[in-house]
Amino acid sequence: AGLPPEEKPKLCDAACE
């Protein structure tokens, strides 16, 4: 939701790209 994929790869896989 604004964090890098390293912090939450499950919530941020393509939305953080």
Curated annotation (Swiss-Prot):
EC number: 5.2.1.8
Source species, domain of life: Eukaryota
Reactions it catalyzes: [protein]-peptidylproline (omega=180) = [protein]-peptidylproline (omega=0)
Predominant localisation class: plastid
Record keywords, A-Z: Chloroplast, Isomerase, Plastid, Rotamase, Thylakoid
Coiled-coil region(s): none
GO cellular component term, pick one: chloroplast thylakoid lumen
Gene Ontology MF terms in the entry: peptidyl-prolyl cis-trans isomerase activity
Cellular compartment(s): Plastid, Chloroplast thylakoid lumen
Job of this protein: PPIases accelerate the folding of proteins. It catalyzes the cis-trans isomerization of proline imidic peptide bonds in oligopeptides.
Family designation: Belongs to the FKBP-type PPIase family.
Protein name, entry field: Probable FKBP-type peptidyl-prolyl cis-trans isomerase 2, chloroplastic
Organism, scientific name: Spinacia oleracea
Upper classification of the organism: Eukaryota, Viridiplantae, Streptophyta, Embryophyta, Tracheophyta
